[in-house]
């Protein structure tokens, strides 16, 4: 047995519920809570109005995710879907998490780029369609329907990522080098991590079943923590989110530019 599967099996045995993914859901809950409280402490006493908006949004992201992970840890937000002769465990609570948290992440980026409300509404609307169609695919009973909805969801994701990499990136560039550097770093993170989600879906238990539920849950947990807590850490340490009254550490991109 490989080390990851062995660790999951031991965790399931210790927790007494027989679910190999429970250990990773527990760790995910803990990491999301740590991220939430870290952002709260970091933002305590911040007076800049614009910075407070970013903190409020960014704190909500791991906060919502921690509630979703805790519910999955206790077996809530879990259902069984029969696909042919096989019964699949589907964590629909994960999609509920994404339905709330991914628009908030996009809102952070939209505020950073200072785009108009129509652009924000379009971005969030396509994102919501991406999540809902992904959930429909996960709950479908035939392989054809599942893969069709997966493709629909993936196309929506490509539209969102294209919008970030073109229109929003251009708008962020107009706001100066600090904003552009932070936006580009965060967008690169989103592009890499979000692209991994449909790949994991297609090779996981909801798709081809190449990897088991325990490993799938571990990988989703790593992606979620990085996409939420990692995103927030980069954003909230940047000068780009502040007015002239306060200034945390510069972004990594700005530091590199200064060194040159």
Swiss-Prot record:
Keyword Transmembrane helix listed: yes
GO molecular function: monoatomic ion channel activity; photoreceptor activity
Membrane side Cytoplasmic: residue ranges: 43-51, 114-116, 173-176, 246-260
Spans through the membrane: 21-42, 52-73, 92-113, 117-139, 144-172, 177-204, 213-245
InterPro entries xref list: Arc/bac/fun_rhodopsins (IPR001425), Rhodopsin_retinal_BS (IPR018229)
Modification type N6-(retinylidene)lysine: residues: 228
Chain ranges on the Extracellular side, renumbered to this chain: 7-20, 74-91, 140-143, 205-212
Biological role: Light-driven proton pump. It may interact with bacterioruberin in the claret membrane.
Membrane topology: Multi-pass membrane protein
Family: Belongs to the archaeal/bacterial/fungal opsin family.
Protein known as: Archaerhodopsin-1
Record keywords: Cell membrane, Chromophore, Hydrogen ion transport, Ion transport, Membrane, Photoreceptor protein, Receptor, Retinal protein, Sensory transduction, Transmembrane, Transmembrane helix, Transport
Location within or outside the cell: Cell membrane
Chain residues in the propeptide: 1-6
Gene Ontology CC entries for this record: plasma membrane
């Amino acid at each position: 047995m490989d080390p990851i599967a062995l660790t999951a099996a031991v965790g399931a045995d210790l927790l007494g519920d027989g679910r190999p993914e429970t250990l990773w859901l527990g760790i995910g809950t803990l990491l999301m809570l740590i991220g939430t409280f870290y952002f709260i402490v970091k933002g305590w006493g911040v007076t800049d109005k614009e910075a407070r908006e970013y903190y409020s949004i960014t704190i909500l992201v791991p906060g919502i995710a921690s509630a979703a992970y805790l519910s999955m840890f206790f077996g809530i937000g879990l259902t069984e879907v029969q696909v042919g002769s096989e019964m699949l465990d589907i964590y629909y609570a994960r999609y509920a998490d994404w339905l709330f948290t991914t628009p908030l992440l996009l809102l952070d980026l939209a505020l950073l780029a200072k785009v108009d409300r129509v652009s924000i509404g379009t971005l969030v609307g396509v994102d919501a369609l991406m999540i809902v169609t992904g959930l429909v695919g996960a709950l479908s009973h035939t392989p054809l329907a599942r893969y069709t909805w997966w493709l629909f969801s993936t196309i929506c994701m490509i539209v969102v990522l294209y919008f970030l990499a073109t229109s929003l990136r251009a708008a962020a560039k107009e706001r100066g080098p600090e904003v552009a550097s932070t936006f580009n770093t965060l967008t690169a993170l989103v592009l890499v991590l979000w692209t991994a989600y449909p790949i994991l879906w297609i090779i996981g238990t909801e798709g081809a079943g190449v990897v088991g539920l325990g490993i799938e849950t571990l990988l989703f947990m790593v992606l979620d923590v990085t996409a939420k807590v990692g995103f927030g850490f980069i954003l909230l340490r940047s000068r780009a989110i502040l007015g002239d009254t306060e200034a945390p550490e510069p972004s990594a991109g700005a530091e590199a530019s200064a060194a040159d």
